[in-house]
Regions:
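Short, charged/polar surface micro-motifs in flexible loops or helix N-caps
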Residues: 48-51, 61, 75-79
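Core segments of cupin and vicinal oxygen chelate
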Residues: 11-51
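N-terminal beta-strand motif that seeds the catalytic metal site of vicinal oxygen chelate
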Residues: 1-17, 68-70, 127
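Short glycine-enriched loop/turn motifs at secondary-structure junctions
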Residues: 3-5, 62-67, 104-105
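Short beta->alpha transition motifs characteristic of CBS
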Residues: 104, 123-128
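Vicinal oxygen chelate
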Residues: 16, 70-117
C-alpha cells in the first residue's frame, strides 16, 4: 500500500498581510492561487507537492510551545540566518540559546524562531 502524502498545513493567523509577507519574504515561499477569493485565505507552495494555507481571522496572537513547529529545509542555514538578522528576527537553538545553531547527531544544522503569530519555525539544512 502506498504511503499517504502531505497535501497541506493550515495555519490560523491574526494579520493575514503580515503573515503573507513573512512566509513570502522571509521564508521564501511562492504564493499560489487559492479558490476562495474572500481575502481570508493565502496559499503557498512548499516543495514539489505540498502547500501552506494561511487563514486569517484569529482573535489574537497566542503563545505556542517550540515542540509544535513547522520545519523548512534550506541549502544554507548560515545564509538563512543572514536573512533573519537583516530583518531583525531573533533565532535560537533547540535549547533556547539566542543566536545559536544546534547541530544534530547526524550533522544537520537547525535553528528556531517565531512567525508573526507566535508559531515556532525550524529551519535546517537536511537534504533527505
Amino acid at each position: 500500500m502506498k504511503s499517504p502524502t502531505l497535501n497541506h498545513v493550515a495555519v490560523y493567523v491574526y494579520d493575514l498581510k503580515k503573515s503573507n509577507d513573512f512566509y513570502k519574504d522571509i521564508i521564501g515561499l511562492t504564493p499560489i492561487p487559492e479558490p476562495f477569493h474572500d481575502g481570508k485565505h493565502s496559499w503557498f507552495k512548499i516543495g514539489e507537492h505540498s502547500q501552506l494555507h494561511l487563514i486569517g481571522g484569529a482573535a489574537a496572537v497566542i503563545s505556542h510551545v517550540k515542540n509544535s513547529h513547522l520545519c523548512f529545509s534550506v541549502a544554507s542555514v548560515d545564509s538563512f540566518i543572514a536573512t533573519l538578522t537583516k530583518n531583525n528576527i531573533p533565532f535560537e537553538n533547540a535549547k533556547g540559546d539566542a543566536n545559536a545553531i544546534t547541530t544534530r547527531p547526524d550533522g544537520v544544522k537547525q535553528i528556531y524562531f517565531k512567525d508573526p503569530d507566535g508559531y515556532w519555525i525550524e529551519v535546517n539544512n537536511d537534504t533527505y
